[in-house]
Amino acid sequence: MFMASSLPVFIFLLSLPHGLTFNCTNSGVCIEKMKQHRTEYLKNEILDQLNMKEAPKGLKPMDPEMKSVYLEMYRDLLEKDEQDMGVEMSFYTAKDPSYGENPSQLVAKFDVTNDLERSDILQATLTVSIEIPAKDSGMLQDVQVQVYEKNEDGSMGEMVTSGIFATKGSERISIQLPIDTVKSWFTISPIQGIFVKAMLDGRNVALHPQQTTADVDNMRLQLSTRPKGSRKRRSHAKPVCNAEAQSKGCCLYDLEIEFEKIGWDWIVAPPRYNAYMCRGDCHYNAHHFNLAETGHSKIMRAAHKVSNPEIGYCCHPTEYDYIKLIYVNRDGRVSIANVNGMIAKKCGCS
């Protein structure tokens, strides 16, 4: 048990976890400092959750056309978001297992680094570029696509899947792969890679890594995975106040984060997002605010009973949402992950 005289120190220590926000007036300088403080906090959280000690450096600039592909993909992902926390999407660009020594052997290898023994694969998608001669472009044609395993000795293995696609020219097509088969490739039954057969007029029009040096034309494997046992629904932030109509009380305000402006061009999408921030004065029994029922709040009530003028409440987020990021990791691989705690949804005083 502690004496009443030690109460202010104890309360100060309890306030430290809420150091993301601090009481300040509507001073522009103070508000800018708060924005910088929260931005730095969010940057550190992103790095921590992506298992990075620092932002990747020395990465090759992404081809603008390839970046457009990922941005379009990001928009599609948001539209059909399953509202699952813990889901990670990873993209693997095909490699030549012979490293150019045997260009006549068409095979695509994918270096999957995910621990698939401890994860469930939700979806496996192979994206392939098909190259149609200019003379045949503009005319709708059916192309039958077949995906085969290539055994470790280089021999042709089993057919994995097939499909028929209507095309008017060169384009990228996506075909779903059997989840159990894909998981076995990277766990119990390793293969050399895959071979794609897309026949048109007696010619295979599917591009393999031996036939192109452009990332945008190369094959890509997209895996959606979730650690076993994790599932959680998301919700959305609702701003309460704005800069033009500021509240004197604790309130939620916009905070736009632009990744290129903070020097983080390794974040591919979104280019910017609203993280929101909590700020404003907290007064006990203020007419515009209900204090959070926490142990901290009870101690603060005790502080008010001893009428200590130096003790105040801290305005801080009480609910958060995640953000989906497409980013380039240290190895130069493009991945997608949901990063928790990136959007403040609701404010409280304690």
From Swiss-Prot:
Which first-to-last residue range defines the signal peptide? 1-21
PROSITE patterns for this protein:
TGF_BETA_1 (PS00250), TGF_BETA_2 (PS51362)
UniProt-recorded name of the protein: Dauer larva development regulatory growth factor daf-7
Q: Which GO terms describe its cellular component?
A: extracellular space
| Prodomain positions | 22-234
Pfam families, alphabetically? TGF_beta
Q: Which UniProt keywords apply?
A: Cleavage on pair of basic residues, Developmental protein, Disulfide bond, Glycoprotein, Growth factor, Secreted, Signal
